[in-house]
Amino acid sequence: MSTTRSSLSIDLNADLGETTGGNPVSDDAAMVAIVSSANVACGFHAGDAHAISNTLAAAAENNVTVGAHVGYNDQAGFGRRFIDYSPAELADEVLYQIGALDALAKARGTQVRYVKPHGAMYNTIVHHEAQAKAVIEGIKAFGADLPVMLLPGAVAADYAEKAGLRVINEVFADRAYNPDGTLVSRRENGAVLHDPEVVARRVVRMAEEGTIEAIDGSTIRTTADSVCVHGDSPGAVAMAERIAAELQSNNITIGSFL
């Protein structure tokens, strides 16, 4: 989150480019008209080359910042299942995904500007030392010192900072939080929030106060550099539009963290 004397600004991001085989899971064209950053799938957890390319073109047309949404090589499980990689293998797969996406991005008039791990990888590197280090090594090997979008307090953030990479602290508009600041498992009731009004007010609170109400009603303090709105959630576009409207009504602008 950035501030001036008279206003606040917050980055809104969404996971996009996840269509495989012509079966869309999100309305990417509509989402890039709302968000300021797009986490674009790289073909490992989801997405095929043509769909990814179309999403990149739409992002470029709307001046939306592009990030590589790297994930485990598991389309069948949508990248939401833990895989016990060797560190070298994981680092290579992360580097491969960034490079492939950047090649497509440049052909569509944009480029990869940051990295956000997906799903099980994202959650694993909150606490898993070996995988956290490997993911950061893969990102660093790309050579562009790309910022890394992570859950606040993640072990991976320590490795990123040691590697000289900027850490973007991410909060989730539509996900429930445990009191310790981790995300409630999707297997639990109430893990995903669906009421646009509730979610919109929550995002304003994140931006203005830097706090989130946990699932037990307690208050969590956090740093919100970027807020994620899931593009594949039911009613994702309507929710993103409501969030944008609520931010605007509270004099909070939507803008990239870069």
Curated annotation (Swiss-Prot):
Catalysed reaction, written as an equation: 5-oxo-L-proline + ATP + 2 H2O = L-glutamate + ADP + phosphate + H(+)
Keyword ATP-binding annotated: yes
Keywords: ATP-binding, Hydrolase, Nucleotide-binding
Pfam families membership: LamB_YcsF
Superkingdom, natural source: Bacteria
Gene Ontology molecular function, alphabetical: 5-oxoprolinase (ATP-hydrolyzing) activity; ATP binding
GO biological process, one term: carbohydrate metabolic process
EC annotation from Swiss-Prot or TrEMBL: 3.5.2.9
Family according to the record: Belongs to the LamB/PxpA family.
Subunit (UniProt): Forms a complex composed of PxpA, PxpB and PxpC.
Protein task: Catalyzes the cleavage of 5-oxoproline to form L-glutamate coupled to the hydrolysis of ATP to ADP and inorganic phosphate.
HAMAP family (UniProt xref): PxpA
UniProt-recorded name of the protein: 5-oxoprolinase subunit A
